[in-house]
């Protein structure tokens, strides 16, 4: 066997290993989905997560705008408004 054939055989074995690993991961995903009674695909789960994250960010931004309005009215920092209502400035 020459060098190219040896390399080709190695690559073919790697491809077979990767295909086997992919099959095992798919089986594991299906098993875990059954255990969790979750029929959603990974794509649907991530799109739901992104949608909820966007909604969270919009609500957080609205809250920050309200806190800024209150701070402007009181002529103080937003930090002072948060401390007054018992929230920390951490996100």
From Swiss-Prot:
Record bears the keyword DNA damage: yes
Induction details: During meiosis.
Gene Ontology terms: cellular component: condensed nuclear chromosome; nuclear chromosome; Swi5-Sfr1 complex
Superkingdom of the source species: Eukaryota
Swiss-Prot/TrEMBL keywords: DNA damage, DNA repair, Meiosis, Nucleus
Sequence similarity: Belongs to the SWI5/SAE3 family.
Quaternary structure annotation from Swiss-Prot or TrEMBL: Forms a ternary complex with DMC1 and MEI5.
Protein name in UniProt: Pachytene arrest protein SAE3
Organism: Saccharomyces cerevisiae (strain ATCC 204508 / S288c) (Baker's yeast)
